[in-house]
């Protein structure tokens, strides 16, 4: 059996298959029917400094080859997480990483500072796709200056592994990736959801209460692959690839394009055990082609 171990900075993962934020709860919800120790890591649902109610319903819609969501980062805040969720997840036998976001840089910094104190949380994933309320609602991750500013601020207070989740809703994602690398990111994860919408033709109204939402699922995979491939040529830090992954072949494509690890997102709603199946599939692929380590595949597109 091949070696599936990978490293993001100084953090070691038993394999490159990770559960994406917002699709796997805090992990503990699935412990009765998924062997969490077989997954390389779990990114928690998004956590903010304060309690958030999220958006009005309806806030999810199925599409022909994916789904739209506009949940709006509903969560009970970082203090609730620390007091009530952390004690339940800290002993799960895999890397539990917290996805954080905020409406201001100050909120993100405060949230990161609190998570930094948790011994059993080795990394955070900073979501920079959220609107910056001090800049007219423009998302932090849509220009290099804002992206660099927020990553630099979080880096000053967060002393473990800092992963930055990039938005695909930009002209050139490689410029943003390079900016956050320079600002201190240990890795980048890409891509987050694309902006889309759906319409109910019977009532002539948008299906989502917010009109638009984040598009995910198989339909975005070719775009995600292209962006991972382009980014791999530009940055030196590890890339975590995500977007439409539903089987081990998809995962291997991302790794060949340059991803050191992958995240499974939307498909968790269809099959919560998919991550363990992908691990088995990657193992089988490496054995079939007589490869000794997953590292031999990263960026090896001919």
Curated annotation (Swiss-Prot):
It holds the Pfam family DHO_dh. It comes from the Bacteria. Substrate binds at residues 45, 69-73, 127, 192-193. It catalyses: (S)-dihydroorotate + NAD(+) = orotate + NADH + H(+). FMN binds at residues 21, 45-46, 99, 127, 165, 191, 217, 243-244, 265-266. Its main location: cytoplasm. The active site is at 130 (nucleophile). Disulfide bonds: none annotated. It is found in: Cytoplasm. InterPro entries: Aldolase_TIM, DHO_dehydrogenase, DHOD_1B, Dihydroorotate_DH_1, Dihydroorotate_DH_1_2, Dihydroorotate_DH_cat, Dihydroorotate_DH_CS, Dihydroorotate_DH_I. GO terms for biological process: 'de novo' pyrimidine nucleobase biosynthetic process; 'de novo' UMP biosynthetic process. Pathway: Pyrimidine metabolism; UMP biosynthesis via de novo pathway; orotate from (S)-dihydroorotate (NAD(+) route): step 1/1. Keywords: Cytoplasm, Flavoprotein, FMN, NAD, Oxidoreductase, Pyrimidine biosynthesis. Its cofactor is FMN. Binds 1 FMN per subunit. One of its GO terms (molecular function) is dihydroorotate dehydrogenase (NAD+) activity. GO terms for cellular component: cytoplasm. Its EC number is 1.3.1.14. Catalyzes the conversion of dihydroorotate to orotate with NAD(+) as electron acceptor. Belongs to the dihydroorotate dehydrogenase family. Type 1 subfamily. Heterotetramer of 2 PyrK and 2 PyrD type B subunits. This is Dihydroorotate dehydrogenase B (NAD(+)), catalytic subunit. It comes from Azobacteroides pseudotrichonymphae genomovar. CFP2. The gene is pyrD.
């Amino acid at each position: 059996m091949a070696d599936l171990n990978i490293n993001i900075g100084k953090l070691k993962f038993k394999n490159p298959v990770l559960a994406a934020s917002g699709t796997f709860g805090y992990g503990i919800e699935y412990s009765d029917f998924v062997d969490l120790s077989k997954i390389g890591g779990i990114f928690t649902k998004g956590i903010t400094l304060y309690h958030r109610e999220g958006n009005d319903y309806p806030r999810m819609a199925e599409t022909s080859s994916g789904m739209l969501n506009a949940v709006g980062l509903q969560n009970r805040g970082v203090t609730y997480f620390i007091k009530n969720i952390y004690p339940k997840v800290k002993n799960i036998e895999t890397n539990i990483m917290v996805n954080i976001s905020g409406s201001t840089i100050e909120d993100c910094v405060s949230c990161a500072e609190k998570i930094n104190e948790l011994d059993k949380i080795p990394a955070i994933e900073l979501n920079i796709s959220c609107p910056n309320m001090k800049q007219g609602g423009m998302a932090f991750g849509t220009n290099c200056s804002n992206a660099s500013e927020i990553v630099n601020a979080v880096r000053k207070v967060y002393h473990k592994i800092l992963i930055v989740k990039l938005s695909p809703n930009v002209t050139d994602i490689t410029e943003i990736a390079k900016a956050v690398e320079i600002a201190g990111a240990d890795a980048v994860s890409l891509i987050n959801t694309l902006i889309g919408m759906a319409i109910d033709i019977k009532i002539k109204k948008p299906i989502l209460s917010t009109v638009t939402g984040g598009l995910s699922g198989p339909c975005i995979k070719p775009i995600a692959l292209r962006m991972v491939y382009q980014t791999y040529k530009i940055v030196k830090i590890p890339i975590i690839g995500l977007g439409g992954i539903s089987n081990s072949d998809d995962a291997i494509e991302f790794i060949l394009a340059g991803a050191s690890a992958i995240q499974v997102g939307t498909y968790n709603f269809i099959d919560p055990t998919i991550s363990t199946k992908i691990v088995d599939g990657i193992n089988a692929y490496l054995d079939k082609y007589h490869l000794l380590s997953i590292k031999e595949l990263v960026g090896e597109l001919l």
